[in-house]
């Protein structure tokens, strides 16, 4: 009976929550990286060098870093529904204002404010999932949610490329139309969040009483079973495992946002139109979505996290190194596909680790710390790519630099599993009935 009840409850909460938060993350990721498509013509229109563009694209993560932990602590206090709605509405407004950038100062200021507005969204969702799904199911659920990132590349790239072709309509440049149109869904969905999301299982009126009682009891028992798990905010901030995971995420973020922000310009160097760039940039994401889900399921099935992160990081590093020697659209496409698969596959097992040893306010602070420090890689990676491109005239040096960061991420993950293990980087494997 319990087996049937568990299956029914998990299916119901998955269908209720996961597709919706996937949609939210799809919009969030698109608004973060559409700057890469804007650069195809915006840089020339506004006279931006590669260095200026790289710093402006990356400065988003400085604002994100400064406000990430406070934002997640507020979410833990006021509830996911209200705070995620606030985050989405404000970031949608700021993203739309990007259409009116006039020069370097306004570019830097608005990208910084976009990071401030969006701070807390991603770790807030990770924390939110820990309220609803048992640890043994979390990597697979996280993978489905995080598949929205490569999906936003698959679907968003052609859309962004097409919107760039609206150049001159009503006197606006194509990149201005892209910012305005792609910002609107965030504001609309922010309002929908207020009416759709449920903060905690205890408040889930869409579950029957038996289903709700089972879920609350299961999640409470899991929290109690952690025993030595840290609960205070300070413990979440000071835990050496949190700092180590932040370093790992730093490298993967550098890879992710180097890919998202610079890939359109790397592809554009082969003489393609914005629309062609959009369709080609979409291809790697198709493979990444499938690989991410399969990799996370394997991680859950075996109960292993460490090597799933290490292998994925090394694959992405190989892809970046391969991209430095790409001489055709086909070879650069293979390289970008390897990077996409590696980066995407690293995320679900990595983000399943913090909630194994943290709970309550410590989890809120710890997850936000990992995300905020780690996302500084999203500043360092794109900024270094731009500076090295201006200095050397080539993307190669910057790509090698980011590949090196991913190798460091793999090494730190291995060291962490041996010096500060939590079940040796393993959880109880999923029992398939």
Curated annotation (Swiss-Prot):
Component of the tartrate utilization system and may allow entry of tartrate and tartrate dehydrogenase. Keywords: Cell membrane, Membrane, Plasmid, Transmembrane, Transmembrane helix, Transport. This is Putative tartrate transporter. Pfam families: MFS_1 (PF07690). Gene3D superfamilies: MFS general substrate transporter like domains (1.20.1250.20). It is found in: Cell membrane. Induction: By tartrate. SUPFAM superfamilies: MFS general substrate transporter. GO terms for cellular component: plasma membrane. CDD domains: MFS_ExuT_GudP_like. Its main location: membrane. GO terms for molecular function: transmembrane transporter activity. It is a multi-pass membrane protein. The chain crosses the membrane at residues 17-37, 47-67, 82-102, 113-133, 139-159, 177-197, 242-262, 275-295, 314-334, 350-370, 395-415. InterPro entries: MFS, MFS_dom, MFS_trans_sf. Belongs to the major facilitator superfamily. Phthalate permease family. It comes from Agrobacterium vitis (Rhizobium vitis). The keyword tRNA processing does not apply. The keyword Protein transport does not apply. Signal peptide: none annotated.
């Amino acid at each position: 009976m319990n087996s049937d009840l568990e299956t029914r409850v998990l299916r119901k909460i998955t269908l209720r929550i996961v597709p919706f938060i996937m949609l939210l993350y799809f919009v969030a990721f698109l608004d973060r990286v559409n700057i890469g498509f804007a650069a195809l013509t915006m840089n020339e229109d506004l006279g931006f060098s590669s260095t200026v563009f790289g710093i402006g694209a990356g400065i988003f993560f400085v604002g994100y870093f400064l406000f990430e932990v406070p934002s997640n602590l507020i979410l833990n206090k006021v509830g996911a529904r209200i705070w995620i709605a606030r985050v989405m509405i404000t970031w949608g407004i700021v993203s739309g204002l990007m259409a009116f950038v006039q020069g370097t100062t306004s570019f830097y200021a608005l990208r910084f404010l976009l990071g401030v507005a969006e701070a807390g969204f991603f770790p807030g969702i990770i924390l939110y999932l820990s309220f609803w799904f048992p640890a043994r199911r979390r990597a697979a659920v996280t993978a489905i949610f995080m598949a929205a990132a490569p999906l936003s590349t698959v679907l968003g790239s052609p859309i962004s490329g097409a919107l760039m072709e609206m150049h001159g309509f009503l006197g606006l440049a194509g990149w201005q139309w892209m910012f305005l149109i792609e910002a609107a869904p965030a504001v609309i969905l922010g309002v929908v969040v207020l009416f759709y999301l449920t903060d905690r299982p205890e408040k889930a009126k869409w579950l029957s009483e038996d289903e709700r009682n089972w879920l609350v009891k299961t999640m409470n028992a899991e929290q109690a079973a952690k025993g030595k798990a840290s609960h205070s905010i300070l413990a979440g901030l000071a835990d050496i495992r949190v700092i180590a995971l932040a370093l790992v995420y730093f490298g993967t973020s550098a890879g992710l946002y180097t890919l998202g922000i610079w890939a359109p310009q790397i592809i554009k160097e082969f003489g393609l139109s914005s629309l062609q760039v959009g369709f080609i940039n979409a291809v790697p994401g198709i493979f990444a979505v499938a690989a991410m889900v399969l990799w996370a399921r394997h991680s859950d099935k075996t109960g292993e996290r460490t090597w799933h992160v290490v292998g994925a990081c090394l694959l992405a590093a190989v892809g970046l190194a391969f991209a430095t020697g790409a001489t055709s659209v086909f070879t650069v496409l293979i390289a970008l596909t390897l990077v996409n698969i590696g980066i995407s596959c690293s995320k679900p097992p990595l983000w399943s680790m913090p909630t194994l040893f943290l709970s309550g306010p410590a989890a809120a602070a710890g997850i936000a710390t990992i995300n905020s420090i780690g996302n500084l890689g999203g500043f360092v990676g794109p900024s270094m790519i731009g500076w090295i491109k201006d200095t050397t005239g080539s993307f190669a040096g910057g790509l090698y630099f980011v590949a090196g960061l991913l190798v460091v991420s793999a090494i730190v993950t291995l060291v962490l599993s041996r010096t500060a293990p939590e079940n040796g980087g393993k959880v109880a494997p999923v029992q398939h009935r």
